[in-house]
Amino acid sequence: MAKIINVIGREIMDSRGNPTVEAEVHLEGGFIGMAAAPSGASTGSREALELRDGDKSRYLGKGVLTAVANVNGPIRAALIGKDATAQAELDQIMIDLDGTENKDKLGANAILAVSLAAAKAAAAFKGMPLYAHIAELNGTPGQYAMPVPMMNILNGGEHADNNVDIQEFMVQPVGAKNFREALRMGAEIFHTLKKVLHGKGLSTSVGDEGGFAPNLSSNADALAVIKEAVELAGYKLGTDVTLALDCAASEFYKDGKYDLSGEGKVFDSNGFSDFLKSLTEQYPIVSIEDGLDESDWDGWAYQTKIMGDKIQLVGDDLFVTNTKILTRGIENGIANSILIKFNQIGSLTETLAAIRMAKAAGYTAVISHRSGETEDSTIADLAVGTAAGQIKTGSLCRSDRVAKYNQLLRIEEQLGEKAPYRGLKEIKGQA
């Protein structure tokens, strides 16, 4: 038995200079797992609660000492002596101990850090890589895939201080033969984009996720400069590289309207979906995330009707990695893909359940980082171990983003042909 003998929590820093929770789980025999909870900027209202201290005299109220104390106190006491390989049991113990719908007693950041640390300790005990242990927990042992990266090379919205409304403009190197080649293509496009922006006298400073954040006059201008960079880097848009958007539309949804202040345009729900559809007709955009507000379910039904057969429509704030909300979406034919973020739901077991539910319903699952990250690269193993097929982990700079790409390189080196890179086939509506 992989007996837990100690659980340790501590306050560490994330990529935005804010505190977050790191946990260690120690087993008999000297096996240790360590993991850290990420943190989001544009968050869905139904996400599990990230517990912050609120003490303005420390870290402007963003300290996590209460969550850390929950790890070192009640969570530790409940897990000592338990089997780290029994992931579902451990997670349920913590969920029951918390006793709230959104984990606001112990904090999703406390529970998640321990949940992931336990999985890492169990993998070490079993003498296998984390992705292999995750595949076993998922009921899909030995079934792997390298994910197509959605590389966020140009930022707007909540991730940048500029006048672009859409939050993320991403490239997907779908024409690559393997992940290693996909990463190289993305890096070359990223560096070429820097030259293009510099040549136009635009800012080349980067946002939270490592993408550039220039002051462009419209969202269409953002797509145009990316097109220029892709072609200048020697790639064909639509064949070698496709585009993806994260609108984070809840951030500019006001009084039932979509207010694109950067463009000076206001749309009603159907009008904004029509606007997005027009962009997909001008550029090879194959995936749109949070194209409407999380509460605009009628609008989502219309968007799915007009684009769902050919464009991947990803619910992030819409579904918040929650099986209850995803069930409603599936039953009503809303969207066709779910973004998977550990900390929206707060445990590994619940995350795996959301991925399985999505796949069973014919939805795709896109594994994602948060804008506030650490060097923790667990999502790379999650993407491969569940054969999810797609990952969002930022741009090609900032070590908090690159850590995930580097882990994927290591995994591909280990697995070789056992983890195929399927390119466009992984994206809903493109197979």
Swiss-Prot record:
Cellular compartments annotated: Cytoplasm; Secreted; Cell surface
Major site of localization recorded for this protein: cytoplasm
Binding residues annotated for (2R)-2-phosphoglycerate, in chain numbering: Q167, K341, R370, S371, K392
Pathway connected to this protein: Carbohydrate degradation; glycolysis; pyruvate from D-glyceraldehyde 3-phosphate: step 4/5
GO molecular function: magnesium ion binding; phosphopyruvate hydratase activity
Active site per UniProt: E209, K341
Cofactor note: Binds a second Mg(2+) ion via substrate during catalysis.
HAMAP family assigned to the protein according to its UniProt record, in alphabetical order: Enolase (MF_00318)
Subunit structure and binding partners: Component of the RNA degradosome, a multiprotein complex involved in RNA processing and mRNA degradation.
Name of the protein in its database record: Enolase
Organism: Shewanella sp. (strain ANA-3)
Gene that produces this protein: eno
